[in-house]
Structure formats: structure tokens, C-alpha cells
A protein has these predicted regions:
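Aromatic- and carboxylate-enriched substrate-binding clefts and catalytic-loop regions
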Residues: 1-19, 23-28, 32, 40, ...
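Catalytic and substrate-binding clefts that recognize carbohydrates or anionic sugar/phosphate headgroups
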Residues: 1-202, 206-207, 211, 224-225
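Catalytic cores of large soluble enzymes that bind and process phosphate-bearing ligands
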Residues: 51-55, 95, 105-116, 208-219, ...
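Aromatic- and glycine-enriched glycan-recognition loops and surfaces
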Residues: 53-57, 114, 152-307
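Short, solvent-exposed loop/turn segments at the edges of secondary structure
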Residues: 56-58, 96-100, 323, 403-404, ...
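Conserved, mostly hydrophobic/aromatic
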Residues: 63, 227, 412, 475
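Alpha-helical packing segments of well-folded alpha/beta enzyme cores
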Residues: 120, 216-223, 282, 316, ...
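Glycan-recognition and catalytic regions of carbohydrate-active enzymes
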Residues: 457-527
Length: 528
């Protein structure tokens, strides 16, 4: 039945006790439904909630399907909710807040749940686009923090304490440095300024505080070197992930320089150019070490026409890509509005990287919609780490996201907040069997890195990261299949993280929450 009203349209379909293959009918999809993967008997929201915890939605998709052989993609940008038998066990109702019905309906003649899922996902991809095949480095551990804003000391407690124990025992005191700063911090005279390369600005320096020091040990380069010194397999580095950071200090605290027509003055553009050169110096250094460089997006991708914008925060993404940037993290500061805004944003970033560098980008985003999968991976947002709940709810989240048509997924290692040595180590262990791993540093009670807590934690984390590196041919083959590319293995279109029923479709228990919520197949042959 179809009920089209002034403010909502509801499609009602029969819910069957069994599917065509004699097993219970089960429902999947809906995008990143945190903590859930099978929705039978439940209600899910198709809305950009921008909430990152269990039961909430961080990247919705108006697409669902059933093991009974059909799927529905609503062609809409409007919020909705899908009731898979929670209110009435005999029917499924799919509602969107609009006064029309526009949908794609997919059908499958598959003989089991795995074939049905592959068929319906293939139909979904034909309409919305195949999932992006990330560059290989995107499946290694990445590091994200701000290195162009705060003040540091290794002798004076000026703020947050960060202790690194490295290869020493966890009982040892380690080495502690101290950071003063945070969101939109402005450094003052006479302090040690963090930088990308251990060098200060040279253009538009009128408002740079006096007597600042620029030591390499407080630079992004030094942190990159730490990963390598501790022999940690490592793929990409974002040196500007933090509000008020930027990637150079030329034009520090300078404002103005905008004409009546919105154009920038030569001095304003010179500061941007000098900061891009600073970024290129870092990107070249990272590339020599085999590490890709990326950027976090807080502001426009072009120098804006707002005279109040500090010059050191201005962006020129095309110039950044020419400087070597191939990773882009589009945070809520830029794409938080979701829906078509998110899709347009990630497409713009994708097109710029592919046009200028002629390479596949690593775009990390959230608050997406149907179609986002052809441009970006999904990260699940900002969660508190340091507890088992963080790991628990991410396992079904990853399974459900993968069943929803976006196989490229990741989250912060041990969350962005909090932190605990045991939880962090367990996170490095299990996510070595997952697509993306993000060391989101600078926000928690501990530094975020696999060498932070000392042995045995450092050694165990290293071992699993090396295991992932050794398995990269297997992982990348599965990434090809997940991108809907035929690898000759009979798994075209199946995600990297596979719900148990995708590999064991004859087992009814594999379709259920009880049977598959906390385990999955990592490709065809590895049980996690």
C-alpha cells in the first residue's frame, strides 16, 4: 500500500515469517546505524542525526533490503523512518517526510541470502555508484592532530601532560611533554610554537608574537618520525586536524585584505602561498618516508571573501593538492549539514584530487547519504574511548554499514576522548581486521598512538599492525571486490567486513543478531 499525504509518504509492504528460501525474513541497510546491523522487528531513522553513540545515526542512507529478494532506495533528501515490524509484526512501513513517492525497487532471484545481498547491492550501486577503491595507504594506520597552533614545553607544566613510554615497560615513567592550547588558541610571546617542519613564518609576520621558538622536536615531522622510529606500519598523516590550526603561520593573526568585490590583496594571497609552500615541505618529507599527507577541512576550499578570517587559516585546496595532499577529512565543521551538501562537498574534493594528481584520493567523511560511497569512506564520529562499550558497539556498526553499501569504514583508535592502555591495545588488535584506523590525537586523556603506553601494549600493537601490513595483498583484493570489481573470486560486490550469512548463507543463525552481532568474516577466509 502507498499513502501519499501533504507532509509524508508511507509505503507499507507485507512482512513474511519466512523468505523464499525457507529461512526467517531479515532486513538490512539504512547506512551507519550505530550498534546495529539487522533491523528485523526494529525501527531505524533515516536522518542526519550527527550522533556518534549506540542507537544513533552518523551517516544515513534511504536504502534497505530483505533476504526475501527485494530492496528499496527512496530517491529523496528528506528524513524518514523505517519500521521493520516493531509496531505491527505483519508489515514493513517506510516513511519519508515528503508529498511524493519516488523510489528504485530492486529484485533478486538469488537462491540464498548471500546471492540476494550481492544482487541487491549491485542494483544499488548501478543507481548510486560503485564504492570508491581507496589507495592502499588508506588501509594502514593514519595520524591526525593539529601542529600549527599550540605552545609546548618539555620542562614546564604549562597545560596538558602527554607521556610517551615507547618500548619501555608500562611501569616506567616515560617521557612527558606539556601542551598549552586547544581549540582556537592564540600563542603568546616567548613560547615554543608547534609547527609542521620546525621552522617559523617569513611572510606577513607583523602580528607574530615576539621571541617565539620553533624547535623541530615540537613539530609534525617529529611525530611522524616517532611512528617510524618505533617501527609502526603507518600510512597517512593529517597535520592540521584541529580548530584554529591551519598548516602554516604566515599571516598569523592578520585580517582584512579583502576588496569591495571580494577579491584578496596581494599580501593576503602571498601569505596563503607561503603556507602552501610550508605544507609542501612537510608533504615532501612525508613522501620520502612513504607516508601520504592529508588535511582536515574547517573552512572553504578557496580563500574566502570574509575580511575577518585570519590569513593563516585561509585555504587553497587546489594548491594543496598540487603540493602533494591526497587525503581529505571532511569533518562536521564543513559537511555537518549532511544530505546533498555532504555529497557535493566530497565530490568536489574527489574531483580536485583526481584531476590534479591523477590518483585515487583517500577522503574520510560522515553525515553522508546514498551515493557518498563512491567518493568517501565513513568514519563514525567523535566518541569517548577508554571503555569496552566503545569496542562493543562498533562491531555491529561496521557490519551494518558494510551491508548498507559503504564497505569503507573506520573510527578513531580508542575514541577521540578518554583513553585506556588495555582498550587502546584491543582496538589496534581488532581493527587490524577492519578497513580504516585513525589515531585521533590531542583530545583525550592520553596521547593516541600505538607506542604511547609502553610494553607489553607497544609490542602487541606493533605486532598486529605488522600483521595487517603483511596481509595487505589479501585486504586489497577484498577492497577490489567491495568496490564491485570482479576479482575472479566469486565475491564481486561483497564488503570487506562480511556478516556471517554472506559466507554461510545456509545457516539460519548467521542472519540473526544473536548469531552474528559480535563476529564477522574479514573477506572470505578469516573469522574475526
Amino acid at each position: 500500500a502507498l499513502n501519499i499525504g501533504n507532509s509524508s509518504t508511507v509505503q507499507t509492504l507485507i512482512k513474511h515469517d519466512q523468505n523464499n528460501n525457507g529461512l526467517s525474513e531479515e532486513f538490512f541497510g539504512g547506512g551507519t546505524q550505530n550498534g546495529r546491523f539487522v533491523h528485523t522487528g526494529e525501527v531505524i531513522n533515516i536522518a542526519n542525526e550527527s550522533k556518534w553513540v549506540d542507537g544513533m545515526v552518523s551517516s544515513p542512507s534511504p536504502f534497505y533490503y530483505t533476504t526475501n529478494g527485494y530492496g528499496v532506495l527512496r530517491n529523496t533528501w528528506q528524513d524518514g523512518s523505517y519500521d521493520f515490524g516493531a509496531t505491527d509484526g505483519n508489515v514493513v512501513t517506510a516513511m519519508h517526510k515528503e508529498s511524493e513517492y519516488d523510489a528504485y525497487i530492486f529484485v533478486s532471484a538469488g537462491t540464498d541470502g548471500s546471492e540476494v545481498s550481492a544482487d541487491l547491492l549491485d542494483g544499488y550501486y548501478k543507481v548510486t555508484g560503485n564504492p570508491v577503491l581507496l589507495p592502499e595507504y588508506g588501509f594502514y594506520l593514519g595520524h591526525l592532530n593539529a601542529y600549527n597552533r599550540d605552545a609546548w614545553s618539555d620542562t614546564e607544566d604549562i597545560g596538558t601532560n602527554w607521556t610517551i613510554k615507547g618500548n619501555a615497560a608500562y611501569t616506567e615513567p616515560g617521557t612527558t611533554t606539556y601542551e598549552e592550547g586547544g581549540t582556537d588558541y592564540m600563542i603568546t610571546a616567548g613560547k615554543n610554537a608547534e609547527t609542521l617542519n620546525g621552522t617559523g613564518p617569513s611572510v606577513a609576520t607583523d602580528k607574530v608574537p615576539a621571541n617565539l621558538m620553533y624547535e623541530k622536536k615540537f613539530s609534525a615531522r617529529a611525530v611522524l618520525d616517532e611512528y617510524l622510529d618505533y617501527d609502526m606500519p603507518f600510512g597517512f598523516f593529517l597535520p592540521n586536524d584541529g580548530y584554529g590550526a591551519g598548516y602554516g603561520q604566515n599571516g598569523y593573526n592578520m585580517q582584512g585584505g579583502v576588496g569591495s568585490d571580494g577579491s584578496s590583496s596581494e599580501a593576503r594571497l602571498a601569505a596563503v602561498k607561503a603556507n602552501v609552500a610550508n605544507l609542501k615541505e612537510f608533504a615532501d618529507y612525508a613522501a620520502e618516508k612513504g607516508i601520504a599527507t592529508g588535511l582536515w577541512t574547517q573552512s572553504n576550499l578557496k580563500p574566502d571573501s570574509n575580511a575577518n578570517t585570519y590569513w593563516h587559516l585561509l585555504r587553497d585546496f587546489e594548491a594543496e593538492v598540487e603540493a602533494g595532499v591526497t587525503t581529505l577529512k571532511t569533518d562536521v565543521a564543513w559537511v555537518g549539514s549532511g544530505y546533498s551538501f555532504q555529497l557535493s562537498g566530497v565530490k568536489e574534493g574527489y574531483d580536485i584530487v583526481t584531476d590534479i594528481q591523477n590518483t585515487r584520493p583517500n577522503i574520510i567523511s560522515l553525515d553522508g547519504w546514498a551515493g557518498s560511497q563512491r567518493y568517501n569512506s565513513v568514519w563514525t564520529g567523535d566518541q569517548t574511548g577508554g571503555n569496552w562499550e566503545y569496542i562493543r558497539f562498533h562491531i555491529p556498526t561496521f557490519i551494518g554499514q558494510s551491508l548498507s553499501g559503504n564497505p569503507n569504514i573506520g573510527s578513531d583508535m580508542d575514541g577521540i576522548w578518554g583513553g585506556d592502555p588495555v582498550i587502546a591495545t584491543r582496538d589496534y588488535q581488532w581493527k587490524s581486521f577492519a578497513p580504516q584506523m585513525l589515531d585521533m590525537d590531542g583530545w583525550g586523556s592520553y596521547a593516541k598512538g600505538p607506542y604511547v603506553h609502553g610494553d607489553p601494549y607497544t609490542g602487541v600493537s606493533r605486532m598486529y599492525l605488522k600483521m595487517k601490513a603483511m596481509m595487505m595483498p589479501y585486504i586489497y583484493t577484498n577492497a577490489y571486490a567491495a568496490a564491485n570489481i570482479d576479482t575472479g573470486n566469486g565475491d564481486k560486490g561483497l564488503p570487506m567486513i562480511r556478516a556471517m550469512f554472506l559466507e554461510f548463507p545456509e545457516e539460519s543463525y548467521a542472519y540473526t543478531e544473536a548469531g552474528s552481532k559480535y563476529q564477522y568474516m574479514w573477506g572470505e577466509i578469516l573469522l574475526v
